């Protein structure tokens, strides 16, 4: 649709203008009406177009996509002391009661809070560190520290940490890398936003809490739509990757060292290779453009939590 409208615009507007020819009112009216009808048709039949694209995906891949989407809806909460709760409910009586019961049972806990990539990290812990019996996450979508979101209040997180500082053995944090690139694609890093994260983490460290800051994860930028279909047909899962996320990782390494913050680069550990790390034995390691799938949380988490640097930070204190 975009290409068709662009062609009409070029043929009947841009071309004549370049040749300094006037456009008749009739052609102008026809062009406007045609563009409107094309856009309207696209809007009306968007579901049919989407279904056509889905049908175009080979059946074996469609089954994998359906499985991945279904698993991504799982909420990993064991009903005991691996607690998965929203930031909005951080002061709810039921959550706080459960917290106190688990404190009596296990003592100190591993705490995570933030956005959807923190959720990926929590799920990876749930699936790869069975000996961690007391783990809490408070999370929200669209939770960048610089973005005002009533469902993601960093002051609530800091207040919770202040109230429970003697019982938090570690605080884990991570974030999506593209949120800290200028214009999403980079290549420049939006350093002032990363510096806001540093300030947030330093406030937690001031409570004498051990913090591990995990860098961004690879972003193949493949949605489960035409991008996936195109990648499959080209047998190339690197067509849309946001490679400049590595610039964010490098800057985070730099400022974490300057501020004495323990930092783990997921990029350095995973060494993501789309040829072998995206589609593995009929499993997709990502559920969308940047979030790990259930399989990916196990697959990448296993690499991270068995890395030497994680073991040094987490087990040797």
Question: Each predicted region: which residue ranges?
Answer:
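Extracellular/periplasmic envelope-modification machinery, especially enzymes
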Residues: 1-7, 11, 15-317
């Amino acid at each position: 649709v975009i290409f068709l409208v662009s062609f009409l615009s070029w043929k009947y507007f841009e071309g004549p203008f370049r040749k300094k020819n006037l456009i008749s009112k009739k052609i102008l009216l026809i062009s406007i009406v045609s563009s409107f009808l094309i856009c309207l048709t696209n809007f009306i039949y968007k579901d049919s177009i989407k279904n056509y694209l889905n049908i175009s995906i080979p059946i074996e891949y469609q089954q994998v996509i359906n499985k991945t989407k279904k698993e991504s809806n799982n909420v990993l909460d064991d009903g005991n002391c691996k607690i998965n709760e929203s930031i909005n409910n951080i002061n709810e009586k039921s959550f706080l009661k459960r917290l106190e019961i688990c404190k009596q049972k296990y003592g100190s806990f591993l705490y995570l809070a933030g956005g959807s990539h923190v959720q990926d990290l929590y799920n990876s812990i749930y699936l790869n560190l069975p000996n961690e019996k007391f783990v809490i996450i408070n999370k929200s979508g669209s939770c960048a520290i610089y973005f005002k979101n009533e469902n993601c209040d960093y002051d609530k997180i800091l207040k919770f940490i202040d109230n429970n500082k003697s019982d938090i053995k570690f605080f884990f944090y991570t974030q999506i890398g593209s949120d800290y690139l200028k214009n999403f694609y980079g290549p420049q890093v939006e350093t002032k936003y990363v510096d806001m994260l540093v300030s947030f983490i330093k406030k937690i460290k001031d409570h004498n809490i051990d913090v591990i800051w995990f860098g961004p994860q690879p972003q193949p930028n493949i949605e489960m739509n035409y991008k996936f279909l195109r990648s499959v047909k080209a047998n190339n899962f690197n067509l849309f990757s946001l490679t400049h996320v590595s610039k964010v990782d490098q800057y985070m390494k730099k400022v974490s060292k300057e501020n004495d913050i323990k930092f783990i680069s997921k990029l350095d550990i995973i060494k993501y290779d789309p040829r072998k790390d995206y589609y593995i034995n009929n499993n997709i390691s990502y559920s969308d453009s940047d979030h790990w799938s259930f399989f990916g949380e196990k697959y990448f988490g296993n690499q991270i939590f068995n890395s030497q640097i994680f073991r040094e930070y987490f087990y040797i204190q």
